[in-house]
Amino acid sequence: MPEALSWLGMRIDDAYGARVGTVHDVYLEADGSPRWIFTLRRRVLIPAWDAIAGAGRVWVPYQRDLIESAPRLWSLDELTPTFETETRRWYAAGKDHSGWAAHIRS
């Protein structure tokens, strides 16, 4: 079983430690590596390839405001290659590592 599936139910924190939501689902690549984290509360996908898990939490290198304003995924039918591309671009434009290294070191 891929390790990322153990993230289900874990708290998601942003790069600064602010709570974002809870892992409701993890979408995997064909090789089992994590691709997207889905949080039901916000109905958004969060890129999982830079996520770090431990101590019952998953940390992602994005600010909560960026995640909260990401494109909404209302149904799995909307999870198309076009939606993924738009979502990937959304996060690429707003990625913030400034608090990431300091948060992980603490």
Predicted regions and their residues:
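Peripheral interaction segments used for macromolecular assembly
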Residues: 1-106
